Amino acid sequence: MPLLERAVAAGRFPSLHRLPWRSDPLAACAYVAELLGDDNAVAQQLAVWVSDLRPRQKRKMLNRSVEKGTHYKWFLGGHRSDYAVWVHQYRPASVFVSSDRFAASIHNHRYPFVSRVLSGSLYISTFEVSSDEPRCSISLKGEQVLEVGDVMFLDSNDVHRIDRVLDDTTTIVVQGPPVRHYSTRFDPRNGCSERIYDLDALFPNLTAAFTKDGFIVG
């Protein structure tokens, strides 16, 4: 069944919650990769789905969407913390190439994910790293170009970088559940890495930002 086949008429994003996101997230992602790989109408179906959103659904989408330095993440749907579906709309090529953060950095993710190119192209490098400790070795593993219709499936430990994009590049992304509370960004210039923690991990230390010696700073 195409991923969006039942989503157009109902105005709801298709549910993928029956997949084994917790017990076998890689198998769940592999199944989604097959769905996306076989669905040549996904871009057109997605355009119809977005245009049919009711005001409340549109507001929910906007409230969950995120702006990054390299791209916009438009939230389409998901199920609790099992999976989430996004459209990544990349910034113009001239803007993207000036960034060395977010998608333009050498990094991995907290979760596995599957991505299909809806428009444009992405030029991607993959890397081998010795560890995600503060000091590590980083070496180029391979390079590839993803064009319209191509599907990419990455584990949470796969280290990669988007080197550049064409103008008007968009992808649909289905991400699985987080397998840890941080992703890692790597700097090839000095062999250093930096862990980027999620809000769940940072929350216990929140009060340290506005208290001192146990007293609230006024």
Q: Which role fits each region the language model picked out?
A:
Residues 86-88, 98-100, 125-137, 163-165, ...:
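A short secondary-structure junction signal
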Residues 190-218:
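Long hydrophobic alpha-helical segments typical of transmembrane helices together
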Residues 166-184:
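A short hydrophobic beta-strand segment most commonly corresponding to one strand
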Residues 81-83, 92-96, 121:
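Short, charged/polar surface micro-motifs in flexible loops or helix N-caps
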Residues 57, 87-109, 145, 155-157:
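Conserved short histidine dyad/triad with adjacent acidic residue
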Residues 1-89:
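A short, N-terminal "cap"/entry segment at the start of jelly-roll beta-barrel domains
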Residues 128-164:
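Short acidic-glycine-tyrosine-enriched beta hairpin
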Residues 108-124:
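Short, conserved beta-strand element in jelly-roll/cupin
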